[in-house]
């Protein structure tokens, strides 16, 4: 239950804080990248995180920033619980021009994709990655959960 609440709070926080918006066919959109495993060893946990993020988006599908309303669009990429596949999933999020990234379930894939997000200037928020190396020395990767001892 605490994990779901943390996911919801993270998603709503991102939806409310980020004003890096794109225009798509006249409508104003904020794209949020969801960098989670939906297959592989951590697929079950990643799917739960995706469900929490999708639920938050269904509850709060738009956000108002400075009096203007923006639609929140989720760009979900499966990093397949693999450090090899994580980089290509991260590159796809960069190519899709997301404003921020949420994820990943599994610290190894977060570490593997970190440089891709850093080079693109995209902030990432680790929802459940607990390895201190995910955020150590990074000005672009943040976390909302505890650290492994």
Identify the residue ranges that each predicted region occupies.
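Structural motif
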Residues: 70-95
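Short, solvent-exposed loop/turn and secondary-structure capping segments
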Residues: 43-47, 87, 114, 137
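Core alpha-helical elements of the protein kinase catalytic domain
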Residues: 19, 51-54, 91
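Short, low-complexity disordered leader/linker segments with a strong preference
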Residues: 1-31, 65-68, 95, 119
